[in-house]
């Protein structure tokens, strides 16, 4: 269940503004309604989060100023470093501890306020391979391999989210739903092999195999077999993400 698509919240949040698709006078809690109805039917609900993707300039300018991301957008020392524009929208930069802490705090809030069964990251990590996205942070790091360094920043973010979930409620699952191909994940600096082979990053990987069996680039059966080879940690489960239109 998507609960945070663009630095917003389809639930009651201290850290994120109300969902962009919700009316200003919305008097109900969409997440709580879904949890109540789903649990009555014996269904589990995993809160689906986009941790880094934010909003367009027009939307950011309308964001209430009590929220951290709005404050960072208004701060010339944070806009362009902690928040970076790529394409037509802004993105959080996971290279900064303060950014990772906000993301972790948002997860803690979800797990402590709601009886969710899991938290899942969507397949949006670094939005670009362009070096200008995080030039300042990379220069300050002293690292020489940008690709490896970016993967480490994503790993730190993922670990922070995993730890936040487990500290709030060890029974709640934490999962990641990456892109369905290794090449797609490499472009986003998503270190899926580490996540599938090392404890402490996630409880499950759910790659988005939105491909048919006859797909010329990533046929379903062969791609699923590839993922089965990547998830070797006994603490990590592989679930295959499918879509209803395939």
Show where each model-derived region lies:
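Catalytic domains of carbohydrate-active enzymes, especially glycoside hydrolases
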Residues: 1-9, 113-118, 198-205
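Aromatic- and acidic-residue-enriched segments that line the glycan-binding/catalytic groove
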Residues: 11-23, 53-86, 124-143
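Aromatic- and glycine-enriched glycan-recognition loops and surfaces
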Residues: 19-41, 152-157
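Active-site-adjacent "subsite" loops/lids of carbohydrate-active enzymes
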Residues: 33-36, 46-47, 52-113
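Conserved, mostly hydrophobic/aromatic
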Residues: 38, 103, 110, 119-122, ...
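Aromatic-lined carbohydrate-recognition surfaces of secreted/lumenal glycan-active proteins
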Residues: 39, 43-56, 120-128, 147-189, ...
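Substrate-binding cleft/loops of secretory-pathway carbohydrate-active enzymes
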Residues: 56, 168, 173-217, 223
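Surface-exposed substrate-engagement region within the catalytic domains
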Residues: 198-201, 213-246
């Amino acid at each position: 269940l998507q609960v945070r698509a663009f630095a917003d919240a389809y639930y009651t949040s201290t850290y994120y503004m109300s969902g962009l698709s919700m009316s200003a006078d919305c008097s109900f809690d969409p997440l709580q309604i879904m949890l109540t109805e789903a649990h009555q039917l014996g269904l589990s609900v995993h809160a689906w989060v986009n941790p880094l993707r934010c909003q367009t300039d027009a939307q950011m300018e309308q964001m209430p100023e009590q929220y951290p991301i709005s404050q960072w957008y208004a701060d010339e020392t944070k806009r362009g470093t902690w928040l970076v524009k790529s394409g037509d929208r802004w993105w959080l930069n996971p290279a900064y501890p303060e950014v990772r802490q906000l993301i972790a705090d948002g997860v803690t809030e979800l797990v402590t306020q709601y009886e969710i069964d899991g938290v899942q990251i969507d397949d949006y990590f670094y939005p670009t391979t362009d070096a200008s996205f995080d030039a300042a942070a990379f220069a300050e790091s002293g690292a020489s391999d940008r690709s490896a360094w970016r993967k480490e920043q994503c790993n730190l973010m993922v670990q922070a989210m995993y730890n936040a979930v487990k500290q709030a409620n060890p029974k709640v699952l934490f999962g990641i739903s990456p892109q369905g191909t290794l090449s797609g994940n490499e472009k986003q600096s998503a270190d899926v092999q580490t996540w599938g082979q090392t404890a402490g990053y996630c409880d499950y990987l759910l790659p988005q195999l939105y491909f048919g069996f006859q797909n010329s680039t990533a046929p379903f059966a062969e791609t699923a077999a590839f993922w089965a080879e990547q998830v070797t940690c006994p603490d990590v489960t592989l679930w295959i993400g499918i879509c209803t239109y395939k």
